[in-house]
């Protein structure tokens, strides 16, 4: 039984949700518009200011799609109202981040600086040289872009150098013991 799928989604004031007969969802809000094709097996009901997702049967596939569909809709509604944000930190001597127009320029100890162009719908802020904020309305795109930045230089376990999420805890290892 999908407990997440059973929870109703409340539609806040100023958000407009449209779902056609093929389960193509369009959510408009103060921050923007999101569109996504949802599973055709699920039945999505909009009554007053509440969205309910109903599954047709109790087989395993429908149970998993039930929770997924509800979560995707909930993320869309939250994205157009509040938006999403990931904070990254650069740890290490000489590790820096700069913003040049729509490019993020990272100096991560390689022989060359790395330039990354911001994807559409994403804003990147660099308040200091060691902090990066990735913001947007689509949770998936924000998370993927933050993961791409982190992938360039993952934190290593000995000194903790690298690009890490702000709330990430790096398990440290003990180095070699000298004679």
Swiss-Prot record:
One of its GO terms (molecular function) is structural constituent of ribosome. This protein binds to the 23S rRNA, and is important in its secondary structure. It is located near the subunit interface in the base of the L7/L12 stalk, and near the tRNA binding site of the peptidyltransferase center. This is Large ribosomal subunit protein uL6. SUPFAM superfamilies: Ribosomal protein L6 (SSF56053). It comes from Alkaliphilus oremlandii (strain OhILAs). One of its GO terms (biological process) is cytoplasmic translation. Keywords: Ribonucleoprotein, Ribosomal protein, RNA-binding, rRNA-binding. Coiled coil: none annotated. One of its GO terms (cellular component) is cytosolic large ribosomal subunit. Belongs to the universal ribosomal protein uL6 family. Part of the 50S ribosomal subunit.
């Amino acid at each position: 039984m999908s407990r997440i799928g059973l929870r109703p989604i409340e539609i806040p004031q100023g958000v407009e949700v449209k779902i056609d007969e093929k389960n193509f969802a369009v959510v408009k809000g103060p921050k923007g518009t999101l569109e996504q094709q949802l599973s055709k097996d699920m039945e999505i009901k909009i009554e007053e200011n509440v969205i309910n997702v109903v599954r047709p049967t109790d087989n395993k596939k429908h149970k998993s799609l039930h929770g997924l569909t509800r979560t995707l809709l909930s993320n869309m509604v939250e994205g157009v109202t509040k938006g999403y944000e990931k904070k990254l930190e650069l740890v290490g001597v000489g590790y820096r981040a700069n913003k040049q127009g729509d490019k993020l320029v990272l100096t991560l100890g390689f022989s060359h600086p790395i330039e990354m162009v911001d994807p559409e719908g994403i804003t990147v802020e660099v308040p200091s040289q060691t902090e990066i904020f990735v913001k947007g309305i689509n949770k998936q795109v924000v998370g993927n872009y933050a993961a791409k930045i982190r992938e360039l230089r993952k934190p290593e376990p000995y000194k903790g150098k690298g690009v890490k999420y702000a709330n990430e805890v790096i398990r440290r290892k003990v180095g070699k013991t000298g004679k």
